[in-house]
Amino acid sequence: EIGSGLVGSEMCIRDRHSDGVLQNGRLLLCDAGAEGLSYYCSDHTRTYPVSGKFTQKQKDIYNIVLAAHDRVAAMIAPHMPYMDIHNASYRILAEGLISLGLMRGTAEDAVAAGAMTLFMPHGLGHGMGLDVHDCEAIGERSFDFSEIAEQAAKSGTCIQRSTWRIEPGTVMTDEPGIYFIPALIDKCRAEGKYKGIVDYEALDAYRDFGGIRIEDDIIVTETGSRMIGGDKRIPITVDELEAVVGR
């Protein structure tokens, strides 16, 4: 999947396509992977600056998402509840948005109110194996999923499906993102959601921003976890991406 401009902001929704022309100043989000000879899948996402250089606004948002991505990679370990990791990523994203003046209060309050789903209306990751989205229903059978579904519905979010405790041998994606989706912003604003937490006037300057997501694949080991690909990972930092696009 590839999206740019406002379509890039909707790349958290499946089956969005764009046949538009890339424009300087826009972002290009590429979510892709490959299947090996053993039929196991991979799934990666990078967000590139079309012009070869991120604007300062884009760089600010990108580095917030990268901080959440790296924190998740450091947290994944055997027997860790994946929802705890999901919420930790939300807190880092919230702290970054607060620092930019797009949200008010504390990160904890933003997460508790469900406000982060305005900016990342999808789960942090999914299981991966012979299918790109592998065994997603496991979380629904692992414990009382109805409670999780109820919490999600109250906050107006998607349902967090990856609710099981991760075990050695599990492969999960790590894919936080921040998206500025005009239709979703307008809906939450009209319904009076997240008053005192989201600064809707400040968001007006981001309506044409699009979205940023960073995704890698992580395998859980007996003692922790490691990123698949190791030091051969796809360029990921601002400098690395600008070097690739600017060639």
State where each predicted segment sits.
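Functionally critical, mid-to-C-terminal surface segments that flank or help form catalytic/ligand
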Residues: D84-S155, I159
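Active-site His/Glu-centered metal-binding helix of metallohydrolases
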Residues: C12, L124, M128, I218
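Single conserved hydrophobic/aromatic residue that forms the stacking wall/gate
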Residues: E1-G8, C12-I13
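Charged, cofactor-coupling segments
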Residues: Q23, L27-D70, L130-R247
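Long, K/E/R/D-enriched contiguous segments that form extended
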Residues: D43, K53, K57-L102, E108, ...
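Internal mixed beta-strand/loop scaffold within catalytic domains of large alpha/beta enzymes
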Residues: R16-H17, G25
